[in-house]
Amino acid sequence: MFFPKFKDERENGMKYTRSLDLSRFRFIDELTELVPGVFLFPSVDIIDRKDTHFERFWIQKEDGSRVPDTFPDELAMVLVEPEGLSILSACSHRGITNILRTVRTAFPELPCNLLLGGFHIHNAEESKYQVIADYLHEYLPQKIGVCHCTGVDKYAFFYKDFGDRIFYNHTGKLIQTDSLL
């Protein structure tokens, strides 16, 4: 479960030690409602492989061999409100469009009010940006907050294409939704 993870040659994951108290973890392997209206999605189907970001990431197995990390443990969190969804992702290695498709399958009738997360396309070729932008034009969230691994370079592209719908998110930013006012 806790295999060492790497980006290139640098260890890049949560280090497992025998002293780690696993009783403090809640392992999620199916769509789970944590509290009323807050859902965790532990499984994101890869529908569009062009929007995946696995390059240079590896897992070291017990025998010392390395296999590509496809981030099967990546989660997305969704706040479901009567007027729509707020979707929170981390670095979206499995693809933000794939995350959106997975969430839309569970809640097809609700619009996306907020999409917040990293898209992991910093320094990526423009075609990676275009895959995401094309999908977001089709399924347009009211607000899109991009985080650090999207990159300032790609944030500029998003701002050009989406205007005031997009903002650059940062640590400590307070975002309120209508039901939490």
Q: Can you say where each PLM-predicted feature lies in the sequence?
A:
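Metallo-beta-lactamase
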Residues: M1-L75, F162, F167-L181
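Cap/insert and terminal regions of metallo-dependent hydrolase folds
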Residues: V67-A76, V80-I87, C91-T171
